[in-house]
Regions:
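C-terminal membrane-associated helical module and adjoining short loops/tails
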Residues: 1-14, 19, 24-25, 35, ...
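Multi-pass membrane catalytic core of lipid/isoprenoid biosynthesis enzymes
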Residues: 17, 22, 46, 63-115, ...
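Nucleotide and nucleotide-moiety/phosphate-recognizing core
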Residues: 28
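A generic "structured core" feature
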Residues: 47-52, 59, 63
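Membrane-spanning helices that line or support transport/gating and their immediate boundary helices
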Residues: 55, 59, 112-120, 178-186
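Interfacial helix-loop-helix junctions of multi-pass membrane proteins
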Residues: 67, 121-123
Length: 193
């Protein structure tokens, strides 16, 4: 296959890591369909492995210069699916408030929609540093809420909820920041007319 074909480089290391993250998602969901320490521990382990692939795929994509269109699409999709589906599965276990899940998922859908509209107009809205911090807090929160129980005198449910409240604040703050950027960018042409 020629290097300049649309499919060139699809089977690179970063994309393979992203696919591995997608493969972890059903394991997390199946584990969380059961209550108890061991299913929660397994869910946390798989979620943690998936989160590590998220760090590594970005690192290798930049280092190897192997950023692909597929990777740009799949990486954020895998992130959103992992976190959103994990949060949804934690609801029946009474480990996370429903309204928090609704707020976070609604924000993700709204921002994804805004970015799609911007891209269709040839405009790139830069990722906010707040969004990166939000993602980190969400990941730690999900790990804590999956573990849920007390280990080594640490109540992981409390740890998870503490990080979740921080993630919620950054979710709303970064969401407002995206809407502000979107409004500024799309109001410029109107002012020039």
């Amino acid at each position: 296959m020629k290097p300049d074909t649309p499919y060139a480089g699809i089977a690179n290391l970063p994309n393979t890591l992203t696919f591995a993250r997608l493969v972890c998602i059903p394991g997390v969901l199946i584990s969380l369909s059961f209550s108890g320490r061991w299913p929660g521990f397994l869910a946390a382990l798989l979620f943690g492995l998936a989160s590590i692939t998220d760090i590594l795929d970005g690192y290798f994509a930049r280092r190897q210069g192997s950023v692909t269109v597929l990777g740009k699409f799949l990486d954020p999709l895998a992130d959103k699916l992992l976190v959103s589906m994990t949060m949804i599965m934690l609801i029946p276990l009474s480990r996370i408030p429903v309204w928090v899940v609704i707020v976070i998922i609604t924000r993700e859908m709204a921002i994804t929609g805004l970015r799609a509209v911007a891209v269709s107009e040839g405009i790139i809205i830069q990722a906010s540093p707040l969004g990166k911090y939000k993602t980190i807090l969400q990941a730690v929160a999900m790990l804590g809420l999956c573990l849920h129980y007390t280990y080594f005198r640490v109540n992981f449910h409390v740890v998870g909820m503490t990080f979740l409240w921080g993630a919620l604040v950054l979710t709303l703050w970064s969401g407002w920041d995206y809407f502000r950027q979107f409004n500024q960018v799309f109001s410029l042409p109107k002012e020039k007319k």
